[in-house]
């Protein structure tokens, strides 16, 4: 997400909500107010600073606003007949680059800084700048001049990407309501500011949540010793268990004590329940009202207009069709799990209640994997020490995409455990960008897995290219004494997925910042990263990624084959859960009178066949609702149709490490960024329209 669990925060997408709104700026003749901001007007290097104090963040935020507004005001005073491509469209793009890079240094620290005051200042900067974004995006005088440019400019003489920039600018202006009466514009502006603040607060609440539970060793039954040894002790015989992923999932998957799992699941799905429920009750009606004012039936209709799906009817049909196809598989998997539970309750002397509870699901899905394929993830992870996985991952991407990575020594980073790499084209030596790896959990750090686009790869005013910069932020388990961080196979998959977003950010080479990196349709953005997950299900690829942390021995061929064969395990229930989340998201953004917790519970029962725990409110913990995926969570499944089609029709057929296919993928899918529509890129790559055949096969189904 971007993230597997949250919206990946991409180059022009904000954790606080929707895409960064159109910043209608003008420039070359009036750029002087911004010259003092940074040296990045004349260089393509990484200019990002991570040592700003709270006071500096506040001061630079105000300076950025004042200086940028001076440019906007100058544009607004231009005579309507004076507008040209150079003094409007191109200059707008030049200023946009400056603003994006400076803003990154101000609002990214809220997600990664260990300093509470810095995080607070960064969050306030994000709110302040988001309000400013909205103000500037709704400048009617700027919009009028852009419309005038379209009417008078000889479009045949400008590059296709520039025409796209012009068309998107006008489209976004209309989606902001700039063609409507001033009174309506002001109403929309006010609501957008409030929505932005609510989104920022929603995810801040989740990031800052420090809930933990305390258990005795007996209550952590069947959890491995290395996990228990890594826990903070409370008194002499109690252990502190947080709700962060490195604690939550091991407990839910391996702890044999039902009451422990019940308490964990209850706590996890009541995080920020009170405050975030209130936020949703305000946010959802505001979105609906803005959509109505703009002429759309629902907020879902509003956001889907810009996606490859285009309409709520297509999304609903896709989800309902997939749900029906998976229904028999889900029923069979639930029956198997229920039999496992019944037998275990008999063996351990537990009361058998005859149903699968929410806190049973991960536990018995793990047992299913172990029984059917003899795979013990705790044993398997000993072959995935993070250093070996990282080296194998980097080598795979370098070989596949024709790149070389070099670690930067003495790099300027936000934490001592963060590393920085430079990316070069292997054939030419050209520097394409840099990426940070922030792999381990810290207090108050962003608690999911995501790629953050930090600096856009685009053209600068002097014609040189600014390098793209991205950060991969995840939360793998910390190394402990005598033992490195060991990754479960699903964490290796997450690593590959998120690094796929990093490569999209780095390899895209566009003229305009707005189209750089992962700034594509929301239901297409996961395609490149999902496609690259296939490498962790290939025997030869897995050999490159693994080595026992003690003696360097390889995984046995037998175990590798079992691991690859296990890919379809629990796929029915896992996919049905994704459908549940997608349906909840669609429902809440088409009917604001619905209660979020009740809607989630309804779909859990109807589609997943596993009841939500009474008293929980999972949507209040669902960061995607306020993280840029509003009405668009379906995109994870939708985009897999495309990613699987690409993989099976090209890589699986020609060889997954075939450098020619890898370069084709880099040039036709990654390099264009958002300068082309996603469907056009797919057609260029596949040489045909995409279909669902490979996707259905990946779910254990057959195309009708």
From Swiss-Prot:
Reaction(s) the record says it catalyses: Preferential cleavage in neurotensin: 10-Pro-|-Tyr-11
Recorded GO MF terms: metal ion binding; metalloendopeptidase activity
Enzyme Commission code(s) on record: 3.4.24.16
Enzyme class: hydrolase
Localization annotation: Mitochondrion intermembrane space; Cytoplasm, Cytosol
Gene Ontology annotations of biological process type: peptide metabolic process; proteolysis
Cofactor(s) the protein requires to work: Zn(2+)
UniProt name for this protein: Neurolysin, mitochondrial
Classification of source organism: Eukaryota, Metazoa, Chordata, Craniata, Vertebrata
